[in-house]
């Protein structure tokens, strides 16, 4: 189809490019005249392609079409006019001229928000749904018949830029191309616009963007974000006009600490804080703005309002002076109308536009591999000297990144001061949950509350997912070299090691883990896991594949291993930090971003980890931590359309429910590590001393709260009595007590509900006829302590033979001497298949049994010997997918095949 493209901007350029790819003939491009010697991106591209380009300053004079302009247009004989973004008024003689007429892109769901400031009004009026319309052009009042519409959710802190970049631009380009395709196929609809709900909103200009303070905080927030970046919502303080950018609504929380700032007409003084400027509505609610712009165009972080500029300019090294001149040359290439770039040259006063900001940022980033630079940084350092000082400071690591504000709960415990975050961690900040909702997390040693923890709500989950998506699609994490990503993960492991005693102490008081075990395993293996996967970051690679050639041409096929995107991770309460590390390390190494839900009863080490991740330099939005109810958070993550992968460790029933939700939703990739009833077979030819020692560890390690715990021991008859005698003797030596006591062997169970289930489990075993040899009851002391327990004479049909206790309960059954196949049949007679073990000195028997056992892990003459390099995961209803080892990366990668013909 012969098309005339009428419009301008990067959006117009992308539509033009895609139409060419579709095979359409663009017979002409009509765009705006050059500005300061620079062509509009649409016109510049078309000129390079040899397409006729027309740059009429106007199409009409005194309401009448200019005949010469119309004739030049008609000479092209276009069959369709496509107006992706057009700021000029096009006469109806041109609109109606082509065979198929004209189509226009409009960034709202018509008939709502007609007019040139549709995106602004969508946000200013707090619409929950936004989107765009492609309609058949009319006389300029946006009332033409609708061809196509697409909707998107408007996020609470969306600005004009974020909703445009996230949806209106990329999906709008696709929509324009689809609309042209429908027209070419003869299938394009013409749907009359409804009259109900129609609005025509005036254009937002600087003069009508003054903030009205006599309204609720949410309305003020919507007004500021609806004018961000153009024209900019403003107020007057003293004799200075201040324009606000980067608004976020604060739904609750305590009064902010900082310096007051009187704003005429405001409900109460604003407060300059470490994170921004807190403003108040007439309802007493709060919002915060990130940046302030002065009348001269200079922009600063709002948190710096009362601070003077750095007292002394940096003294540049010879290398930095050379770099400065290279950047000066880049400014000169952009500001072609300026004869010389002086230190005082102002980027914008010299004629730069928003597209030039993008170009400058990309040029500097190209010269400084790995430098994190954003468009807004240019607005904050508009003069050349300021810009160089800012870039050099950043290269030196003196970039003045905003300080992470943590409302710690401090505890004097374990001979140290432990500082514990307790809020949600979203987009690099600790914040309260919506409505200020909290719950108590309890110390199982004495049953007392440690602190109140924020309880995430649906809006918090959506905000976290949006932050993770933004970080993946547009943030530094997604653009970073894999080796640089690995360096950050190595740094994270180092920082975790520096804080290992504090992490282990928090783990002990929150989960009941014995401190020495927490230090070695809970925390120690977490550190090892991040180090291991840090090393994988730059070793993820595809392969080349020989395929049949399309003779006489040749073909090359190769594969790419790519990150999935936003991953939801849900972890259990038995190893709070280690389970986080097992999944998150592989996920991050693959290049994904994470929204993680720790167990509701053990959230504290995950929140401390979030704090340490900021210290390590992990960018905002890459890691998000949401404490709260699994039924709410886990369900929402499973249902959320922007989450592309769920990694879950927990019970089999919940795992099934998650898998179903992921299938019904957007067919997410899922990995599940579920329940277990791991068999441990001990033959009479074993090293009995070692078998007793490892058998006890297989059951009582970490109080039995161990996914691979030996749920059932099968003993050859000839050693049964001796084994039981020795185990009982060793159990009696175990010290039960405070997990922070270095001599303690056995700490409290994780939480009260679990303790009650263990008591009920043992009562069931006794009722069914199993012999309770030792334990079986709660320890008479404060806290959730349960005695190590031993059952014998357990037969296959009993409840305790089939169901997992997830506690310190040893279930012992006999089998006849030499009957290997029979004991294998009994061991495999379960729907679980997470782990297993065998003790024997006969290598042939060991290999035979390890082959026949239906489990993801088989331990031979050892138990619980997991390693970061060895894959971990189960069979059958114990789930699928692997943690640890190279195979874990597969859970967080997708494979793309690329075929080239040449």
From Swiss-Prot:
CDD domains: ALDH_F1L_FTFDH, FDH_Hydrolase_C, FMT_core_FDH_N
Gene name of this polypeptide: aldh1l1
UniProt keyword list: Cytoplasm, NADP, One-carbon metabolism, Oxidoreductase, Phosphopantetheine, Phosphoprotein
Family from the record: In the N-terminal section; belongs to the GART family. In the C-terminal section; belongs to the aldehyde dehydrogenase family. ALDH1L subfamily.
Residue span of region Hydrolase domain: 1-310
Record-annotated site: Essential for catalytic activity: 142
Gene Ontology terms for molecular function: formyltetrahydrofolate dehydrogenase activity; oxidoreductase activity, acting on the aldehyde or oxo group of donors, NAD or NADP as acceptor
Enzyme class (EC, first level): oxidoreductase
UniProt GO cellular component terms: cytosol
Notes on the domains: The N-terminal hydrolase domain has an NADP-independent formyltetrahydrofolate hydrolase activity, releasing formate and tetrahydrofolate.
Residues holding (6R)-10-formyltetrahydrofolate: 88-90, 142
Catalytic activity: (6R)-10-formyltetrahydrofolate + NADP(+) + H2O = (6S)-5,6,7,8-tetrahydrofolate + CO2 + NADPH + H(+)
UniProt cross-references to PANTHER family, sorted A to Z: ALDEHYDE DEHYDROGENASE-RELATED
Descriptive protein name: Cytosolic 10-formyltetrahydrofolate dehydrogenase
Annotated GO biological process: 10-formyltetrahydrofolate catabolic process; biosynthetic process; NADPH regeneration; one-carbon metabolic process
Predominant location category: cytoplasm
Assembly: Homotetramer.
Gene3D superfamilies: ACP-like (1.10.1200.10), Aldehyde Dehydrogenase, Chain A, domain 1 (3.40.605.10), Aldehyde Dehydrogenase, Chain A, domain 2 (3.40.309.10), Formyl transferase, C-terminal domain (3.10.25.10), Formyl transferase, N-terminal domain (3.40.50.170)
